[in-house]
């Protein structure tokens, strides 16, 4: 047979020749060979056709000498016909023959003449051409009817046509089992109307050897014409696979819509084979009234309307064992109640047969409700109303909350038109179908509650707990919930809480498919409830039963799963907040604590002893206060004026002083990086007009500057939050890893000193009766940190600004009550350094914008009116260039907006240059050379008689949308670090630590550079990266006559015990040299102050310093230079 030689080129030739109906060029097929799976499939097919002559012609030659490697192109003539003539065409653009190979074969036939002589004649085979490509099949849809029912019917038809093939597959799957051999074949009407695309589908879903099929459908099913062959393509990309997944999701939504519209269609889905045991009384699932549940890890593919013949062989093999276990399990349950054995079986184990067939536990509509009239059917839509996939399962104290309405708006409107004003939920079913490995001990709990009830004890409907490794689990409850037709519009009728205590799977993996179904009916003033006797009996029995260990609930759980024992449920149902009126125009924010739903784990027994002692009932709900780490108080004087310093709270002292459970967790974890929630509790009062500021000072930079008078230049330069007295209790979130930049050690500080400063931004208009204080509560969960450094606040790059601004608050604008047509301006010199008296204050927002010369775009922000509720004003904000206008008619022609109740605004920056500068020259004024936001009081301010205090307004800028940035101030260039001059000694040595800092010297004059990079160092706590240093110097004497040099040495540790690294010596005549400096230590990052941590450092030694006129050091950040911990710095 010979050896075959494979290559991508030859496999592409083979695939192209054997798939001519797909089309595609040779180059496209060659690209397909890059997929290893496709290449292996083609190679396997070649192996199965080794005997073919054309295959041997293609693969028997060594690589490089075959017909596929012909320099003129693929020699199709030799591959297909065996001739030596090269296939006609341009080399490199060959195509295979468009007709079969045998059409060109010549058959030599032997014949004997009349004279007895043997002759030969040549004859070409006459092979007919294939039939022409038929046109695609299509069927138009009729116009929608003008009524709602006509629209629904048209929608049903459209969705039915889209899912035609799936429904036909289900019908084909049932035919061989529904009709045993020898019986006449009765084909359903839906099956006869099906249209199929390929003959393979018929042979796949139906046994073509059955003669009855030919009698019913001679020639097979009706087939539409074949569509045109698609062009060959490369393997699907990620985007194509994503689109296919979204299409499948849309099909699932279409199925849900059809179900909600009441369609009764076949659907191929997943169901479970029940285990060899059944429900017992000592189990794990709880419910408020009645529960029935079954589970099994094995699954198989069946139809939702499974025929009796499909489940017959399953029930026969398990019937004997099932009867024994039913007697053992139910006898103990019935013995503890007033029910008989048969009543208990009908109430709880009747669902086992439905699980076996893949059907829901809910009874059919015709069995649940009786018709209300002779010609009226049951007014219900039942079964599955919610299906979702669970991924990113919450663990610990996190709980996934799902809100949904069992009844759609269309259904409600339909029955409202019939005079029905209420809906009754008679039964609720929860089904959990897990994915993953059998025997997975991950527990999962689903709790169902009534969403409009604030008391969780009263809202509780039921819960279901299972192990994911035990397969499908189902539970059914009979709440009898009745509500108005208007309530479902609130989108929160039923609340589901999903949680796990020990989930360890990936966050992006799908754990389970959870389905929730309801059995419901619509009733009105003239309609009575029509619950059938079976459903009514189940409801009555569910309310009369009592569990053996849970109290006022029945525990029915699966038995015989792969995971032994029972899940321990721990679902945290989080609290909320609400507003409560406590006085005239005064409201209080009431925080509701979270609640814990707990089920203690216990072992199962196959049989329940009727003489066993009843255990102590465990509560299902308990009110807890979670995560309280510390507390403190802040005194407030009765006459609290603007700029008043109140108090500073140390975060570490608050936690350690409280000595709660979180402090113990902190000691155990050691290093933590928590997310703090600070709750400031104070009574609301809308008459004072006080606004406080809570400033988070992670590195203790502003404490000394606000001890007497708190200037907004400091309190608003660090992360801060506004506390309005009129709003009452306020909550603030502090991401410690982001705002501080690194983790906290439990026993001592490292770089940080986190403090909360409380100061007064706008003073009180009315003096209070006495001094008072408010309470500060600190909530956090202390878990061990995985690293020391947190999230960097800023990473240096040439295009770092994306338009978002945080904590950019303008000091209060005060409107005089006696002024009319007043205005206040906010300058857009956002890159200018703040000045407080003789000091400069560097903060992050100003430094970030100073990297650019100018900016344009849309300024978005919010206006906070901080005056008492007795004041009033109407504000219009516009953007203007070069001052303000005195022509009010012109003002209203400018683009602007009025400040509404929420205070938000969005104004495009107006400038003759389309941008406004971010800094100014010293001689320029802000009113003449920049754009401003002008807030015009077009009406007001007004206040009652006797009021004299000004009306304060605070503006916060949150974003500059669509920023039109100019060129950077220093694009990818060096920054000036320091200049040394006027040397007094010859031998000079400068020690540069592993940080960017302010260098000082007693033997020379030092001049520090002023640039955005040094400002960024100043307004952060830590920095880390690599600096490229460039040293340049000038000489005092003539060039060439000076002697001496500059020695640069890299060291690690200290001089006494450290290690020496690379070193270089540069002669003074070189006039400069370059090196690099690593910024950081063994912890990762360094502050800009001296610190005795083991790290690298640099020594610059001058042996003839007096010969130098000046030494200049430039620096440039390399790569991703990172800054951690947002703060400010005063110079």
UniProtKB/Swiss-Prot annotation:
Q: Which residues form the signal peptide?
A: none
Explain the post-translational modification: Specific enzymatic cleavages in vivo by the P1 encoded 3C-like protease yield mature proteins.
Q: List the record's Gene Ontology CC terms alphabetically.
A: host cell plasmodesma; viral capsid
One Pfam family name is: Nepo_coat
Positions the record marks as coiled coil are: none
Q: Where is this region: Disordered?
A: 213-236
Q: Which GO BP annotation is one of this protein's?
A: transport of virus in host, cell to cell
Under the GO molecular function aspect, what terms does this record hold?
structural molecule activity
Return the Pro residues bias intervals.
221-234
- Tagged with keyword tRNA-binding: no
Kindly give the InterPro entries that the UniProt entry links to this protein: Nepo_coat, Nepo_coat_C, Nepo_coat_N, Nepovirus_subgr_A_2A, Viral_coat
Report the superkingdom from the record.
Viruses
Q: Does the keyword Transport apply?
A: yes
Assigned keywords, A-Z:
Capsid protein, Host cell junction, Transport, Viral movement protein, Virion
Q: Name the family the entry cites.
A: Belongs to the nepoviruses RNA2 polyprotein family.
Additional comments on file? Virions are comprised of 60 copies of the coat protein.
Name of the protein: RNA2 polyprotein
């Amino acid at each position: 047979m010979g050896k075959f030689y494979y290559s991508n080129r030859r496999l592409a030739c083979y695939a192209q020749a054997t798939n001519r109906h797909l089309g595609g060029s040779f180059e496209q097929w060659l690209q397909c060979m890059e997929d290893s799976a496709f290449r292996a499939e083609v190679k396997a097919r070649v192996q199965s056709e080794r005997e073919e002559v054309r295959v041997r012609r293609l693969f028997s030659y060594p690589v490089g000498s075959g017909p596929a490697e012909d320099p003129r192109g693929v020699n199709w003539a030799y591959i297909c016909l065996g001739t030596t003539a090269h296939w006609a065409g341009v080399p490199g653009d060959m195509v295979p023959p468009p007709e079969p190979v045998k059409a060109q074969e010549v058959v030599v036939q032997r014949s004997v003449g009349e004279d007895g002589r043997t002759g030969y004649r040549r004859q070409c085979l006459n092979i007919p051409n294939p039939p022409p490509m038929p046109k695609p099949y299509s069927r138009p849809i009729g116009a929608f009817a003008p009524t709602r029912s006509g629209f629904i019917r048209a929608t049903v038809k459209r969705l039915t046509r889209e899912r035609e093939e799936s429904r036909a597959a289900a019908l084909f799957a049932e035919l061989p089992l529904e009709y045993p051999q020898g019986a006449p074949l009765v084909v359903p009407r839906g099956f006869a109307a099906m249209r199929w695309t390929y003959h393979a589908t018929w042979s796949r879903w139906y046994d073509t050897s059955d003669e009855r099929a030919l009698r019913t459908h001679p020639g097979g099913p009706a087939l539409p014409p074949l569509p045109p062959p698609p062009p060959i393509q490369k393997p699907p990309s990620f985007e194509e696979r994503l689109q296919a997944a979204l299409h499948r999701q849309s099909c699932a939504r279409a199925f849900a819509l059809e179900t909600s519209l009441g369609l009764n269609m076949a659907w191929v889905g997943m169901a479970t084979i029940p285990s060899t045991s059944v429900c017992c009384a000592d189990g794990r699932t709880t419910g408020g009234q009645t529960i029935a549940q079954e589970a099994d890890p094995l699954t198989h593919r069946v139809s939702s309307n499974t025929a009796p013949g499909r489940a017959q062989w399953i029930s026969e093999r398990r019937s004997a064992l099932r009867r024994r276990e039913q007697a053992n399990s139910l006898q103990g349950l019935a013995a503890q109640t007033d029910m008989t054995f048969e009543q208990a079986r009908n109430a709880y184990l009747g669902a086992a047969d439905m699980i076996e067939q893949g059907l829901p536990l809910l009874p059919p509509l015709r069995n649940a409700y009786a018709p209300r009239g002779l010609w009226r059917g049951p007014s219900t839509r039942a079964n599955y109303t919610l299906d979702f996939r669970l991924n990113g399962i919450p663990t610990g104290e996190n709980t996934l909350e799902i809100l949904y309405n069992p009844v759609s708006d269309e259904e409600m409107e339909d029955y409202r038109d019939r005079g029905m004003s209420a809906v009754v939920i008679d039964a609720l079913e929860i089904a959990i179908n897990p994915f993953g490995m059998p025997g997975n001990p991950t527990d999962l709990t689903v709790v169902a509650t009534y969403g409009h009830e604030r008391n969780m004890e009263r809202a509780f409907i039921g819960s279901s707990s299972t192990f994911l490794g035990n397969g499908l689990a189902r539970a059914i409850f009979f709440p009898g919930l009745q509500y108005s037709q208007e309530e479902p519009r609130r989108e929160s009728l039923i609340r589901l809480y999903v949680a796990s205590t020990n989930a360890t799977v990936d966050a992006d993996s799908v754990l389970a498919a959870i389905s929730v179904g309801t059995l419901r009916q619509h009733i009105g003033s003239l309609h009575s409830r029509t619950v059938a006797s079976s459903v009514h009996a189940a409801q009555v029995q569910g309310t009369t039963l009592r569990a053996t260990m849970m109290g006022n609930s029945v525990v029915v759980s699966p038995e015989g799963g792969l995971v032994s024992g029972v899940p321990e449920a721990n679902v945290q149902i989080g609290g909320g907040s609400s507003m409560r009126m406590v006085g005239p125009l005064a409201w209080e924010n009431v925080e509701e604590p979270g609640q814990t739903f707990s089920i203690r784990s216990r072992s199962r027994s196959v049989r329940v002893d009727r003489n066993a002692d009843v255990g102590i009932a465990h509560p299902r709900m308990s009110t807890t206060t979670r995560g309280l780490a510390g507390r403190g108080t802040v005194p407030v004087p009765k006459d609290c004026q603007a700029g008043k310093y109140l108090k500073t709270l140390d975060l570490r002292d608050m936690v350690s002083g409280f000595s709660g459970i979180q402090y113990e967790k902190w000691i155990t974890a050691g290093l933590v990086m928590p997310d703090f929630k600070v709750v400031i509790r104070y009574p609301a009062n809308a008459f004072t007009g006080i606004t406080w500021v809570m400033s988070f000072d992670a590195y203790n930079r502003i404490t000394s500057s606000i001890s007497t008078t708190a200037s907004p230049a400091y309190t608003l330069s660090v992360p801060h939050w506004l506390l309005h007295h009129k709003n009452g209790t306020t909550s603030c979130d502090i991401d410690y890893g982001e705002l501080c930049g690194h983790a906290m050690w439990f026993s001592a500080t490292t770089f940080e000193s986190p403090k909360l400063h409380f100061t007064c931004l706008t003073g009180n208009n009315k003096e209070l009766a006495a001094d008072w204080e408010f309470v500060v509560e600190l909530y956090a969960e202390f878990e061990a940190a995985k690293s020391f450094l947190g999230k960097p606040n800023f990473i240096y790059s040439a295009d770092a600004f994306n338009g978002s601004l945080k904590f950019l608050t303008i000091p209060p604008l005060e409107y005089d009550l006696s002024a009319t047509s007043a205005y206040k301006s906010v300058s857009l010199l956002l890159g200018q350094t703040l000045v407080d008296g003789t000091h400069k204050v560097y903060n992050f927002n100003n430094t970030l914008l100073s990297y650019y010369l100018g900016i344009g775009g849309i300024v978005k922000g919010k206006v906070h009116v901080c005056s008492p509720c007795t004041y009033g004003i109407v504000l219009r904000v516009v953007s203007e260039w070069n001052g303000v206008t005195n022509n009010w008619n012109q003002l209203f022609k400018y683009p602007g907006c009025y400040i509404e109740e929420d205070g938000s605004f969005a104004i495009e920056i107006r400038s003759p240059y389309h941008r406004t500068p971010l800094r100014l020259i010293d001689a320029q004024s802000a009113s003449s050379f920049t754009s401003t936001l002008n807030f015009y009081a077009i009406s007001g301010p007004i206040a009652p008689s006797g009021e004299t205090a000004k009306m304060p307004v605070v503006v916060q800028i949150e974003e500059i949308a669509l920023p039109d940035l100019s060129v950077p101030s220093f694009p990818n260039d060096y920054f000036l670090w320091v200049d040394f001059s006027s040397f007094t000694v010859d031998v000079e040595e400068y020690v540069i630590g592993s940080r960017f800092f302010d260098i000082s010297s007693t033997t020379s004059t030092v001049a520090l550079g002023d640039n955005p990079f040094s400002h960024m160092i100043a307004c952060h706590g830590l920095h880390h990266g690599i600096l490229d240093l460039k040293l340049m110097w000038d000489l005092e004497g003539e060039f060439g006559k000076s002697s001496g040099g500059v020695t640069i040495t890299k060291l690690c540790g200290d001089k006494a015990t450290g290690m020496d690294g690379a070193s270089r010596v540069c002669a003074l005549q070189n006039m400069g040299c370059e090196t690099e400096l690593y910024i950081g230590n063994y912890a990762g990052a360094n502050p800009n102050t001296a610190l005795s941590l083991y790290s690298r450092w640099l020594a610059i030694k001058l042996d003839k310093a007096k010969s130098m006129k000046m030494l200049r050091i430039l620096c440039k950040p390399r790569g991703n230079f990172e800054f951690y911990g947002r703060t400010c710095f005063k110079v």
